[in-house]
Amino acid sequence: MSGWVVAAMDALNYAGAVRFTPESDIPDLSGKVILVTGGGLNQVKAEEAIKSVKSSVSNDVEVVWIPLDLMSGKSIKNAAEQVNAQSSRLDVLILNAGVMALPPGETEMGHEIQLGTNHTGHFYLTKLLLPTLLKTAEEPDSDVRVVSLASVGHNFAPAFEKILDQEKLKKSLFAALGSKFLRLSGSTVQQGACNSLWAAAGAKKEELSNGGYHVPVGILERRNKWACNEDMGKRLWEWTELELTKANL
């Protein structure tokens, strides 16, 4: 696979950021299939977003909404099946959805909502879509990427064994171990999207650090020491796989 990108959400761009204008710096993506999670809270919101996107792109660009509840294993499986049914390829997967500061609660797997949504749900979705990603990566001139949005908040996480802020750290470890993957950051809605767009489509292969952590825009940044720890990453991966097995997923 060409690259696994982690994207961190930041309030400010960093000094030394690369020059990047999505409108002019993203190459022609004709024929590519891109999946972005978190495109709308519900069908109405998603359709409003799709209408807005279609008003500014060519008519031959197909934009569709696929229902996905990252707290539900069944919903995740259904979404992956719909993706594979609609296309035999997947060029870019952007793990954009995320929640925080919600009332206490659990996902169907029995995980705390924030952890279950931001980490476990995306892990399961990626696992189901991995065969399609790998198949696409085998094609000539392919450039398959997985972008995982995270946060500089992972730097404030305490020791790995403690719970506070661990879902941010888990996303960092997940991406770092995955292939090994990448990462990014943001500001306003428009500015915040730039780092993800850069990693997903704007950056050339040689500009990406597979498994690295990129902050806005395109700067390879050092990560929390736990996020760089391969043993911790292995433990997280194995724990997540075990949790999926326990949930019969």
Give the predicted meaning of each segment.
Residues 3-4, 10-174, 247-249:
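Rossmann-fold NAD(P)H-dependent dehydrogenase/reductase core
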Residues 77-80, 189-200, 230-241:
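Short, amphipathic alpha-helical "lid/cap" segments that border enzyme active or binding sites
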Residues 2-10, 204-249:
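C-terminal tail/cap regions
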Residues 116-119, 186-189, 230:
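Short, solvent-exposed loop/helix junctions and linker helices
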Residues 68, 184, 225-228:
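Pocket-edge positions in alpha/beta enzyme catalytic cores
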Residues 73, 119-122, 189, 193-196, ...:
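Short alpha-helical patches at coil-to-helix transitions and adjacent helical residues
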Residues 162-163, 167-209, 216:
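SDR active-site lid
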